[in-house]
């Protein structure tokens, strides 16, 4: 498959070869790796990348991804970071209008009788800036022999990806991770990852938030190695009964497997380091069809034989959950940790109750923001915000107007902050979408 610049204009195409969305869990080869937060299977690609700015698609270096292309005259840019805050393009703030209103007439494809199919709307625009990024890397020894993926945690707004001259995929949706399989084209040394980012696409009709408009790779980029058996997706549902001391635990998991083998998957719950419950999951195998990767699914629901400590903002009590994957010899292949809390949220006669008691929310709206770096923030800024929350007796937050970085949600669990998480979906008043 080859990349097509016309995908920018087509509202029906918003992902090509992108992996399905899945849970945001970490995973490790052993408990020792987990305790040390080992990077055995994760490598950050953040840092200085080669970069070329172009005003539109027609003037971009269209062949920059090809092997042997001379990019010696490219600039250097920091990833993650907004392109506009590193000396290129212009900063723009818009609230209730599309960013091109008053400059260009655009209506979404098929939205009104004379809208047409949108051909050339963005791909042939005189102003639709493009950022061409190049990163070179060698494969870590711990990655070799495993499946290798790249994860972009946030890219505004549409991106094309190549590795070693081969087209990998395309994605829109600026504030959710996009993950791609690099395995067929990865090398031990001298890999060339190329990313072409376009400021606007048909996604712009849906991503019309009231904030500063930027573009570029503004969140971290990670290489991930997946072992022969890997937990792809996990859903954990802690259920607190009316007694507030008893409850159930529901677990659903989906695993991928390079080749068929017997495995044992065990759910384990710990309280302050001590195992208080564990149970094996019954797994079902299914062939994916066109792929060589087998899919394995499992589910369980059990009443916990413990006296539960509920979670609330006064006492955000968390239990340590782990999903263990072992082979037929009982050797650990992978573990997936998750911190979970038990709470019961209800609305009775238009009143919110938590664990049977009325809940009073003292909340705020929060943008991811740092004065010099825009929405490109780190965990340091997140912790400062949480400190301000606690100093001002704030117990709830609305992530206006987009999904925040993944660590933020874990921090809110730990700090006892009720979180309303937005999807990145906002249309202006009287929109024709």
Where are these regions (language model features)?
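Conserved, mostly hydrophobic/aromatic
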Residues: 165, 221, 319, 356, ...
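Beta-strand-rich binding/interaction modules
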Residues: 163, 247-284
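Accessory beta-strand-rich segments of carbohydrate-active enzymes
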Residues: 2-22, 31-36, 50-54, 82-86, ...
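Conserved small/polar residues in nucleotide/adenosyl-binding loops
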Residues: 423-429
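Surface beta-strand/loop "capping" patches
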Residues: 228-258
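Extracellular recognition modules
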Residues: 194-196, 320-324
